[in-house]
Amino acid sequence: METLAPPVVAVVVAHTPGPWFEETLASLHTQDYAELSVLVLDVASTEDLTARVAAVLPTAYVRHLDENRGFGAAVNEVMAMVDGADYYLVCHDDVALFPDTVHLLVEEAFRSNAGIVSPKVVSWADPERLVHVGMTVDKGGSVVDRVQPNEIDHGQHDAVRDVFVAPGGCTLVRADLFAELGGYDTAVVAMGEDLDLCWRAQVVGARIIVAPDARVRHLEELAGGARALDPALLASTGEEAAAHPVTLQELQRRHELLAVFKCYGRFHLIRVVPQVLVMAIGE
């Protein structure tokens, strides 16, 4: 049956995922959106993920990447691999979508003429607890959540609204916008990819929104500290993990500052940089 729904490709970046991965795949399999294809990028996993993917989502495509150069670099592969998609649904390997998530994101993208759409992100273990409902940023580039830690969802954040950052985990991105931006900045190997992409998208005039009716559970294995950062990523940035074990917070702040210097205009930088330096000294 022919449909007018725009084609969406879900791009799942997986690196040695744990037992939760099957639930991630199953949640994509049960989507009520007809024009959804799934591409799993197996990024230097210790074991081939093909069999695990096929057992749950046999229609998915699997692409193996031998080197882990970061989340953004992996997602960028989609631009050379996929033709005809109107949207990319960029996913971590530890998210679980509700059955109507994709169609609600696409509907709101059309209704609001948005380039990037974020769902309401809730706790993996307790979906009544909010994790993210879009994010904002201060003048120094630091990302600020719009919800409190362990805040209970009573519908208080259920209005569609513009946000500065669509937090990583599960993000709908218009394919032509992604191509115009050149994808993710591969210098941002981990932590801060979402801020960088969204800030650059706004520089070219794109709208970023949160659509809270669409919901996603997120385990947040890396950000929560349950999964270690791949040492290969540190090596790619020139860091020596043994000599200086860089923290996720340090990486996040480094990439926030990178976004500031890339995205602010010259005159705004002259005003903001001294304030950022003072804040850095205070920290």
Task: Provide a role label for each language-model segment.
Residues A26-E35:
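Short, acidic, metal-binding catalytic loop of nucleotide-sugar glycosyltransferases
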Residues A34, D42-T50:
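A conserved acidic beta->alpha catalytic loop
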Residues L65-D83, D93:
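Glycine-rich, basic loop-to-helix element that forms the pyrophosphate-binding segment
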Residues Y88:
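Short aromatic/hydrophobic "clamp" motif used to bind/position activated sugar donors
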Residues F98-D138, S142:
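Conserved donor NDP-sugar-binding/catalytic core segment of glycosyltransferases
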Residues F164-L222:
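A short, conserved alpha-helix in the catalytic core of glycosyltransferases
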Residues V204-E283:
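Active-site-adjacent helix/loop segment of glycosyltransferases
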